Curated annotation (Swiss-Prot):
Keywords: Cytoplasm, DNA damage, DNA excision, DNA repair, Excision nuclease, SOS response. Signal peptide: none annotated. Interacts with UvrB in an incision complex. InterPro entries: GIY-YIG_endonuc, GIY-YIG_endonuc_sf, GIY-YIG_UvrC_Cho, Hlx-hairpin-Hlx_DNA-bd_motif, RuvA_2-like, UVR_dom, UVR_dom_sf, UvrABC_protein_C. This is UvrABC system protein C. SMART domains: GIYc, HhH1. The UvrABC repair system catalyzes the recognition and processing of DNA lesions. UvrC both incises the 5' and 3' sides of the lesion. The N-terminal half is responsible for the 3' incision and the C-terminal half is responsible for the 5' incision. GO terms for molecular function: DNA binding; excinuclease ABC activity. Residues 208-243 form the UVR domain. NCBIfam families: PRK00558.1-5, uvrC. Pfam families: GIY-YIG (PF01541), HHH_5 (PF14520), UVR (PF02151), UvrC_RNaseH (PF22920), UvrC_RNaseH_dom (PF08459). It is found in: Cytoplasm. It comes from Acidothermus cellulolyticus (strain ATCC 43068 / DSM 8971 / 11B). The gene is uvrC.
Length: 641
């Protein structure tokens, strides 16, 4: 049966217009976002006989507490709003694309005054260019090693670059011809940027055109009897030709396309992409998709394209002219219009029927099938172990349900100074690092016990405060035709309660945490402590600990939680200690206020590097004169003695 709190809207309440809808749970978190050409037809289908619904759709409807929707003018607007909401709320019942590994990219930091070429993983930054993804980081380094001879661009970090500027000498790459050394003025910033832009042109698919230009310049230099330059251009052309030959030619020259294939079963699907530029495979990427509802291949392709190209932000170069898919998406025309607007030129979605493109699509499909098989083999053991661990913890602690969300707290201190605490979160037995939190504790007495009481009080006081705000609507000022934004819709730091709280320690720490929860009137959160020495599990109001077998999966999971909380607390404590030590050294110097302290640290990065600097280098910091630099130099070297 449907959850009793979810009211079925009357048919007349739901418009027949295109729009986007949201399901919310009892904690006012968005759990599913969808779009529809006809909202009435789509939403009514969720309230059919539960036995006819896909099992995961049934689970979603059962978990839902309320439903709302927004009308939009066009299907393209619906597609864009659906993507934005999925990105904003991260609903747990929407399809989640998880990379089967963290693929590296070759990043070009065009947003910086002196751009840098680097291996990069993580969220893309506006203004930079990204090439790839590559299967391995060494593949990027091999490519760079070949191309830096032709395009001697900067690859060093900001610290190395500033050091070269200070000492007036480039690094080794400058001396062997693999960097043009803008740090010491061998080329100007404008000349270096042109080198980088030429590199981007070659990586973007214009390698053959650039090679022809090199060969033309080489012949012209030879004709002018400038044999030294001709020899250098010949070597550059050979290096570029070698880099091109390392990439497999799969389609005719000037073909820019993304080739996408899927392999799926009832529960999951693997998606694989080959990125083809200038007829060559420039990179590939794979995802594993959890099928939350009954979706056919056309629907999967639709969802995947929306998320893949929505993810790239405003980088029009990431959207190719042609996208090859095994089955046409469920709304090809809308997708093509949306992608064309993102690219700034026409984009075609095609299903190849014969020839090289069909053969390449079959190759990508084989990769997807292999990825799905490997994923299931790996996950079979992992899922079994995690499920067993959660069941063992449930049984050992006598919990009503398996603890799907566990929070663990640890305190770090050094002789009572810089007391900090950490909160780490595991969901379904896996770390949820976006939910980790750090606490700075000031004026807390009682050692670890007092610190545990303080951090638990702060965490759950915030939880109660944010839960109180969930009924407070916020008008985002976009007008009556735009969706109202609820306060609870936005990600809050502490708005979701855990199934189980673990504290690092024994009976005293557990008692302190229990006292904090009691003071706040919270009685529906399970609590336990894990003592380090004998790995005993302490429960509130029990004189004897619970002992799990040494080889049990449940104990292993609790140890991972405790160790992760300890690592996170220690790293925060070290950072705070380093900051306070730096501040204490500079605070004792006459004439150095907060502004100048920040200027010194921005320029040098650390007190150690300041100690290595000369008076002239200290005086080069903005806002610092010669006299102040001499005072700082004397104070720093006096501190050494």
């Amino acid at each position: 049966m449907h959850a009793p709190q979810l009211r079925k809207p009357a048919a007349g309440e739901i418009p027949e217009s295109p729009g986007v809808y949201r399901f919310w749970d009892a904690h006012d978190r968005v759990i599913y976002v969808g779009k529809a050409k006809n909202l009435r037809a789509r939403l009514t289908s969720y309230f059919a006989d539960p036995a006819l619904l896909h099992p995961r759709t049934r689970a979603m409807v059962t978990a839902a507490a309320r439903l709302d929707w927004v009308i939009v003018r066009t299907e393209v607007e619906a597609l864009q709003l659906e993507y934005n909401w999925i990105k904003q709320y991260e609903p747990r019942f929407n399809i989640k694309y998880r990379d089967d590994k963290s693929y590296p990219y070759l990043a070009v930091t065009l947003a910086e005054p002196v751009p840098r070429l680097m291996v990069y993983r993580g969220k893309r930054k506006k203004g930079n260019r990204y090439f790839g993804p590559f299967a391995h980081a060494w593949a990027i380094r091999d490519t760079l090693d070949l191309l830096l001879r032709v395009f001697p661009a900067r690859t060093c970090s900001a610290g190395v670059y500033r050091r070269a500027q200070r000492i007036g000498r480039p690094c080794l790459l400058g001396y062997i011809g693999k960097c043009s050394a803008p740090c010491v003025g061998w080329v100007s910033e404008e000349q270096h940027r042109q080198i980088v832009l030429d590199f981007c042109d070659v990586m973007g698919g214009r390698a053959t055109e650039y090679l022809r230009r090199l060969e033309k310049d080489m012949r012209a230099a030879a004709a002018a009897e400038d044999f030294e330059r001709a020899a250098r251009l010949r070597d550059d052309a050979a290096a570029l030709r070698l880099a091109i030959e390392k990439q497999t030619v799969v389609l005719p020259e000037n073909t820019d396309a993304d080739v996408i294939a899927l392999a799926d079963d009832d529960l999951e699907a693997a998606v694989h992409v080959f990125f083809v530029r200038d007829g060559r495979v420039r990179g590939q990427r794979g995802w594993v998709v959890e099928k939350v509802e009954a979706l056919d291949t056309a629907d999967l392709v639709q969802h995947f394209l929306a998320q893949l190209y929505g993810e790239t932000g405003a980088e029009s170069a990431d959207v190719p002219r042609e996208i090859l898919v095994p089955v046409a998406p469920s709304d090809t025309e809308t997708l093509e219009r949306w992608l064309s607007s993102r690219r700034g030129g026409r984009v075609t979605i095609r299903v190849p029927q014969r020839g090289d493109k069909k053969a390449l699509l079959e190759t990508v499909a084989q990769n997807a099938a292999q990825a799905l098989h490997l994923h299931k083999v790996r996950r079979a053991g992992d899922l079994t172990a995690r499920g067993r661990a959660l069941r063992e913890i449930q049984e050992a602690l006598n919990l009503p349900d398996a603890p799907l969300r566990i929070e663990c707290y640890d305190v770090s201190t050094l002789q009572g100074t810089d007391v900090v605490a950490s909160m780490v979160v595991f969901e379904d037995g896996l770390p949820r690092k976006s939910e980790y939190r750090r606490f700075a504790l000031r004026g807390v007495g009682g050692g670890d016990v007092g610190a545990i009481h303080e951090v638990i009080s702060r965490r759950f006081r915030r939880y109660l405060d944010e839960r109180m705000q969930t009924d407070s609507p916020i008008d985002d000022g976009t007008g009556p035709d735009q969706p109202r934004v609820d306060a609870a819709a936005h990600h809050r730091k502490f708005s979701y309660p855990p199934s189980l709280v673990i504290v690092d320690g024994g009976a005293p720490q557990v008692a302190a945490a229990k006292k904090a929860l009691d003071e706040l009137g919270i009685d529906d959160v399970a609590l336990a402590g894990l003592a380090k020495r004998l790995e005993e599990i302490w429960l509130p109001d029990r004189e004897e600990p619970v002992i799990l077998p040494r080889a049990s999966e449940g104990l292993y999971l609790l140890q991972r939680l405790r160790d992760e909380a300890h690592r996170f607390a220690i790293s925060y404590h070290r950072a705070k200690r380093s900051t306070s030590m730096t501040r204490s050294v500079l605070e004792g110097i006459p004439g150095i206020g907060e502004t100048r302290r920040k200027a010194f640290l921005r320029h040098f990065g650390s007190v150690q590097r300041m100690r290595q600097a000369t008076v002239a280098e200290l005086a080069a910091v903005p806002g610092v004169g010669r006299r102040t630099a001499e005072v700082v130099f004397a104070a720093l070297h006096g501190a050494d003695q």
